[in-house]
A protein has these predicted regions:
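Functionally engaged cysteine thiol sites
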Residues: 12-14, 54, 88
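N-terminal leader segment of winged-helix/HTH proteins
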Residues: 1-35, 130, 138
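N-terminal helix-turn-helix DNA-binding core of bacterial DNA-binding proteins
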Residues: 22, 26-69
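A structural signal for well-ordered alpha-helices, especially hydrophobic packing surfaces
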Residues: 21, 107, 140-143
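Charged, amphipathic alpha-helical coiled-coil/dimerization segments
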Residues: 25, 75-134
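DNA-binding alpha-helical recognition surfaces that contact promoter or target DNA
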Residues: 72
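Flexible interhelical turns and helix-capping residues at alpha-helix boundaries
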Residues: 17, 21, 52, 63, ...
Length: 143
């Protein structure tokens, strides 16, 4: 055993998480292409479908995205007609985001079958999926 075993890729927790994330997102791609969304745009829309309206800051915090990623993402969603951005009436410094009529229920309806379709691609029991879900959120809570 050498002094650098801790630097082997196979000994890193981060690598299988990274690789699995990339592979899972690949499974989403064909479904998301049909509704003209990238994966990051899709998760942003999921937040907006839940909350109906939120600030850019809240959206970024929820999705762990910085403004350098979020700004072009929102610009693209706005150009597609899925969202609108406006200044908060309470605080002009705050930019609010909300789905348009098309980006709201219409797009949500088209996206509705995606989680089940993607989930069926993986050979995980309901118990395994629940355990993985809990462990991943436990890790996120420690970051």
């Amino acid at each position: 055993m050498d002094n650098y075993d801790h630097l082997k890729l196979e000994n890193q927790l981060c690598f299988p998480l990274y690789a699995a994330s990339r592979e899972i997102i690949k499974k989403y791609r064909p479904f998301l292409d049909e509704i003209e969304l990238t994966y990051t745009q899709y998760v942003a829309m999921m937040v907006l479908w839940e909350r109906e309206r939120c600030s850019v800051k809240e959206l970024g915090e929820t999705l762990y995205l910085d403004s350098g990623t979020l700004s072009p993402l929102l610009k693209s969603l706005e150009a597609k007609g899925f969202i609108t951005r406006s200044r908060s009436e309470e605080d002009e410094r705050t930019v609010m985001v909300e789905p348009t009529l098309y980006g709201g229920e219409a797009l949500r309806e088209k996206a509705s079958p995606i989680p089940q379709a993607v989930g069926s691609c993986f050979d995980l029991s309901a118990e395994e999926a629940e355990t993985l879900y809990r462990l991943l959120y436990k890790l996120l809570g420690k970051c």
